[in-house]
Amino acid sequence: MKPIALSIKGLHSFREEQTIDFEGLSGAGVFGIFGPTGSGKSSILDAMTLALYGKVERAANNTHGILNHAEDTLSVSFTFALQTNHQISYKVERVFKRTDEMKVKTALCRFIEIKDEHTVLADKASEVNKRVEELLGLTIDDFTRAVVLPQGKFAEFLSLKGAERRHMLQRLFNLEQYGDRLVKKLRRQAQEANARKNEMLAEQSGLGEASSEAVEQAEKVLEQAEARLEAMRKNRDQAKERFTEHQEIWNVQKEKSTYEEEEKRLAEEQPHIDSMQKRLLEAETAAALKPYADRYAEAIQHEEQAEKEQTLAQKDLADRTAFFQQKHEEYEAWRQHKSEKEPELLAKQEQLSRLQEIEIKLSEAKQEEERKKADLRQKEEALQSVMNELETVTDRLTRGQNRQTELKQQLKSLQVTSDERKSCQQAAEMALRIRQTEEQIKKEKKRSEELNLVLQKMNEEKNTLVQKTEAEENNIIQAYEAVQTVYHLVCETERSLTRMTEEARKSQHTLHLQREKARVALLTKELAQKLTAGKPCPVCGSTDHDPSASVHETYEADSHLEEDIKRTDVLLTEAAALSQEILSAKIMLEEQSARFIEQCPFLQTIQAQNLEAAASFEHQPVYEAFETAKFEWKRIKQDILSVKTRMAQMIGAYQESLKKAEQLNEKIGFEKREADRIESIISELQSSMDSSLNMFKEAFQNQSVDEAEKWQQAIEEKDRAAEECEKRIEKSIAFLAEHEAQKEKLRESGHRLEREKLELHYAAERIKSVIADYEHELGDYAKGDSIQIKLRSVQQDLKLLKEKEQSLYEELQSAQMKLNQAKSRASASELTLQEAKGRLEKAKAAWLEHTKNTSITRTEEVEQSLIPADELEKMKTGIDQFMDKLKQNAANLKRVAEILAGRALSESEWNETVAALQEAEDAFGAAIEEKGAAAKALAVIRDHHKRFNEIEAELKKWQMHIDRLDKLQAVFKGNTFVEFLAEEQLESVARDASARLSMLTRQRYAIEVDSEGGFVMRDDANGGVRRPVSSLSGGETFLTSLSLALALSAQIQLRGEYPLQFFFLDEGFGTLDQDLLDTVVTALEKLQSDNLAVGVISHVQELRARLPKKLIVHPAEPSGRGTRVSLELM
């Protein structure tokens, strides 16, 4: 863990935000934080713990009184890095707001991971505290004992008791993984192993009979079934051969009957087919003539259409010729009119255009004349305004000079001598200090009275809380005894259930043997009943059967045997589940008891009374005992739930009371210290005020404190009046200079305006002469309509002449084009008519030629004789199919006659053959099923036999695994292993610290660990005598604690993976002489090579002179400015 930056604002004496750059500060390995006493050096460490854990250890209630009295908000921000393979940075931000004079509340809290971008990991105070402790693996107590050592905490690790020191080392060196976590892991594995064992026992019980004798019996049954199957197969094959022969004759006979019926049906259909063939011939003839009939009818239609079109074209040609002649005459007449009118209009247009230009110039000249007159009037007005303003400025300047003279005389009368001012100032300062001291004494006395009332209430509350805590301890002891009693009941129930389960397994084995013996006897009896005298036995092959033997060996199956086996199987399954449930409850009670002892250490001495009587169902029959056990277990479960809930509630209330008592003690201690401090302040203030009054009387015998204040006020009034005079004189100097400059500027403006006025007058006269010349040129044209209107009229007449000519020309061209089109259509229609007549003659000749040998004479008959193509195709297909069927049926009759060759089969003979085959097939199928059932039964028994053996082997392995886990649980019970590791780690730290201490004390002292885990000193200078650490002097305690802290910091790995890269000291250097101080600083300077930065907080000047990099803490100022920090390099 490496610090990067720390920002502080509003904490203790800090007001403005101050940022400390640790990266630049810790580059040399060792750096110092220096400043006078009370400047705020220790507040830097407070800011670090406040940012990380939200607490200031030396503050009451961890946060009371930490906010600067002149601020309403406090903010801290700490950025640090954790170095693994690659460095990851984190930033913790906290902002607090004031709630009253002492208390603050969290306003903002964030924990940020800094990589390529910032990621907020937590934004609530509790979550941030949890994430910081998880990341670092240190509580605030660990942090202030091993990393950041504030005032009063330096020697705490040295004096910690053994158990508390071991717990701290467990967290510092991440030893929890070898303690509770390892025990829980072993317990979980043991629970899983027992569950697996119970599952296998239940599975083994459910397999039923799986002995080797059962396998052999099943194999014999399978051999008998195979022999029967072979006999049935031969019988079925013979029946199949006879069936195949009769089936062929029967099927051919049925086929012949079908062909004879088909022959009769075809003979009845023959007349209809003949009619269809005649109609088909007529349709084919009409189809051949249709193209000629269509061409003939089309030619007649085209000839009629061509005659109509030719008539219309001739009429259109005559109309277009008359229209063209009319347009040609109109165009020629307008051309003649244009040639006469156009020259006259063009001459008039040119004259009007020149006069229009003159008219525009005249208008512009008149506008310019008006502008010049307006400018002239403006200049005259501006000149008058400047002259008026010049008169006003001159008057103000005179009055200002007179007032300045008066102010200078007044200032001279208000001046105070330096001696008078000095005496007055001394008297006022002494009077102010006396008044301030009086007010402070009143304020502190009031605070003292309020604190005494608060302390009285707190002591009353403390007495009540002590009584409540003692009562809660007694209740917890009673509840814990109840928990232990329930635990013993659970253990007794578990042992009884184990014994009952063993008895049930024995009973199950006996029942299975009885069932197998009864099944063999029953099979023997059934086989003996089926034997016939003189025939061989299918099992042994003997022909001599002794009925007495089967009767003698037959056993009647017990009707209750199967029911007893099922009951036993169910009981074992339920017993396994109940055993698992009891084991879980037992483990849960053990864990709960451990937690209760951890939360309430006084419970370690409490032991529950042993139960003398065992469970009441031990000597009952198995089934009754199991029902009793289930009933008892339900009652015990209720007891477990009851005592667990009751115990948890009591411990919660007890811990809450302890927490309240601890908080109350802290508050009482703080308030007592605060009351003592206030009394001391009041005494000091009273002494200071008496001394100040005596000094005032000696210095100013003729004045009282009140008169001194009034004297100071009088001088201050004179000073304020003189200051006001000086300000007014300064303003008057600027005022007079400004008005003098303004007066000169106004004079220049008046001269300039006079010149501009004359220039405008002359320009207006010149423009008036130009206007007269333009009006003379226009003459009479300026009267009546404007020249622009006359010019627009002439231009409109010229435009009309051209547009009308163009329009008539376009109409003439259009008429010409339409005339040409009409001529083309007339010629084309004449040609089309001649061609239509020729085609008609050819089509008529072709029609007559092709119909002369047919019965069709008119084109209409062709359409009447035609048949649609799909219907025609259907008729052809029907005729072809009929002919094919006729031929095929004759061939089939011939073929079946050859196959039968005179053979015949009656229906009764065929039915007998079918029945015989079915009977043979049924017998063969029954034999197959019988063999399959026997084979399946054999396979099931073999699988069960194999699985039974596998489970037996696995049970042995699991039992060995459970035994090993039980041994490990016994070894790791309690925290002995973790304590061993912590002691080893402590020995390592002590060896390293002893080497450092030996160097610091010139081989005089060494440190060792005693048998109880505490530290003792070895005085090598006095023959190795051991001394308790409590006998050390202040300087010796500092050196020993420093050695331990450096050794601990060098070995700490946060969460077992992050190296600790910094260490802070905040006391102790003042107890060292010059030689020891040099030795300590030299040792600290050597730490740079160990990748460990050490920060030293001190006010010792000799230490400040030795360190190359220093952070200087400047104390707060009376003006209100807060503590500031600055970096100083050697």
From Swiss-Prot:
**GO molecular-function terms, A-Z:** ATP binding; DNA exonuclease activity; endonuclease activity
Domain of life, source organism: Bacteria
- Per the UniProt entry, what are the Gene Ontology biological process annotations, in alphabetical order? DNA recombination; DNA repair; DNA replication
Q: Name one GO cellular component term.
A: DNA repair complex
Q: Which SUPFAM superfamilies match?
A: P-loop containing nucleoside triphosphate hydrolases
Instruction: Return the InterPro entries for the record.
Output: P-loop_NTPase, SMC_SbcC-like_nuclease
Name the protein family.
Belongs to the SMC family. SbcC subfamily.
Role summary? SbcCD cleaves DNA hairpin structures. These structures can inhibit DNA replication and are intermediates in certain DNA recombination reactions. The complex acts as a 3'->5' double strand exonuclease that can open hairpins. It also has a 5' single-strand endonuclease activity.
Question: What binding partners and quaternary form does the record give?
Answer: Heterodimer of SbcC and SbcD.
Protein name as it appears in the record: Nuclease SbcCD subunit C
Provenance organism: Bacillus subtilis (strain 168)
The taxonomic lineage of its organism, from the top, reads: Bacteria, Bacillati, Bacillota, Bacilli, Bacillales
